[in-house]
Amino acid sequence: MKYIALFASLCLGAAASPVRERQTAQANISGFSASTSGAGNGASISFDVEIPDRVSTHCSYTDETSGSTLPTINQTPCDDESVIWQFKQDPSSPGSEGQYRIVIIHALESGAAEAGFHEWSASDFPLEEHTGSSDETVYAGASDFAVDMS
């Protein structure tokens, strides 16, 4: 009987405790650009990230090996290494090309992290065909957008 009373008081105490809502932030992405080289020898992705009152940094990637399609980029640090990002195109399904996705991860001083992502349809990354030279992919969507972080 003592155990039931103890268990009941613990449950009531836990139920009376306020539940903290997880704080969310918004990462403002600006100047986003992504393309492959018309010469068929490289790719570049570049953008700025600002999470108000937390961090502001520049993120970029370049290579000299990509062909006409943008590469998958695994977790890559920005200039401020508390922010890392990754970029990929999802696998295609029958009748459609896969969506593109960027993931932003910010390591907080507490040791926790917040993350969010943004998706685009494949039509925002058209493959431009060029006669006599290599094809290239050039991002054609909005250069500024927001990512909800949690």
Model feature map: region roles:
Residues T72-S150:
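Acidic, low-complexity intrinsically disordered segments
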